[in-house]
């Protein structure tokens, strides 16, 4: 394996953030970058990662998925729950559901209200969302037209259930929005997806890394499992990794950029001697710097599926039958169209379940077939389902390494559903969803409630169902939170620099101080775009002046 020993920057993790940094930093021809990825290439001929409709497949094996498990979750019947994370060029953008959702404007204004994060307002972040994006129907004040990330919008003629579901949400009294990433997130409407015009997954490997790979100043090493960051005193000076179980080293002249994501980044820091001193001493890890927030503040989104039989034969159930799949695959492969070219999450919404919330606290994804996210337990009959979950749970978890061995998975505990608010939100979510499915727009379609089943009505029954059946939405975050140095639990400052150390930044979803209202791929890419300008010493993009919606205490729904 040929790698030089010295680079300006070493990036750990070729995922949603790392590939953005690698691409932007190597635009400066005099800068050398080493990009380390524990997984393999993103094989372009592997339909499992490239076909949007095949999104369940990468979660089923371990080629593309770290397949972490939580410790027994105490409020979830002590279940050890899935915590899938992407492995390979593209990271989790190689295996995610491809929903292009940025979060609510108020999420970022909320971040910016925290000491030290003043330049993370929505209007500061919006130019970087736009910079990353090329939207298929063209740019506007909210969307970009020249970015590496391809975004596809739902089109007329898609499955009729999508429009019916949006209409039902409006009939139930909730707002309609024509763009969940535009002026107003709150309401029901079409959902954009990170898919190319030719119907392929638009991961950061395809969008960004394809631009950077030909550059002589970028070196990419796959199957490189990071062991630890190397320090000289309080300065990060390099990285040690394993390649075929053999230790390799490189040094960084300027900075080490940690982009491992919300599970891997705290692990790597802790193994490197940065984290809670008591934990590190108990594992005989030499302490470089005591930072109690490393691995703390862990957050995620939890979600439920509500599944219904479909009275009309218009769902995607036939696509699950093996004898129909060759034709679907051929149309996608040769034409880039058809069922295979969509992730099938083409409608959804964000609502407030109660006026106690200043911005939406529930997210909906609608799917015109009933099946688990990982492809298990498909319903054979015509059916559809709604995914619903709370967005800003007060529950907080933690990540602890178990040993110095980089091959050993960490101890992960989210403490899902550990607050009363969690239970109130999930009870409301299930009851509101049933109301939506009872509206006239869905009356021609909505049949028997398959799951949870109409017999479950009381709080106790709903709570028991949630404990047994709620699953992760695969949005782990916030485990190395941004904040002012005066906050003892903050790990990095507003520019991603690790407190108390030099030459080390974290750039990924772990630095979010609070999880955003929506999916995490688009915000993670934005964070990397924004911090790439900081690292390069460039003037930040001018703040946007686009207007955006605030509920300001408005009723959560219109009464009929």
UniProtKB/Swiss-Prot annotation:
MF-aspect GO terms:
betaine-aldehyde dehydrogenase (NAD+) activity; choline dehydrogenase activity; flavin adenine dinucleotide binding
- Which PROSITE patterns does this entry report, sorted A to Z? GMC_OXRED_1, GMC_OXRED_2
- Species: Stenotrophomonas maltophilia (strain R551-3)
Describe which pathway this protein belongs to, using the record's wording.
Amine and polyamine biosynthesis; betaine biosynthesis via choline pathway; betaine aldehyde from choline (cytochrome c reductase route): step 1/1
Q: What NCBIfam families would the database entry show?
A: betA (TIGR01810), PRK02106.1 (NF002550)
Family annotation (Pfam families): GMC_oxred_C (PF05199), GMC_oxred_N (PF00732)
The family database entries (InterPro entries) matched by this protein are listed as: BetA, FAD/NAD-bd_sf, GMC_OxRdtase, GMC_OxRdtase_N, GMC_OxRtase_C
GO cellular component terms, alphabetically, are: membrane
Q: Which SUPFAM superfamilies match?
A: FAD-linked reductases, C-terminal domain, FAD/NAD(P)-binding domain
Q: What is the designated name of this protein? A: Oxygen-dependent choline dehydrogenase
What catalytic reaction does the record list? choline + A = betaine aldehyde + AH2; betaine aldehyde + NAD(+) + H2O = glycine betaine + NADH + 2 H(+)
Keywords attached to this Swiss-Prot or TrEMBL record, sorted alphabetically, are:
FAD, Flavoprotein, NAD, Oxidoreductase
The record's similarity note reads: Belongs to the GMC oxidoreductase family.
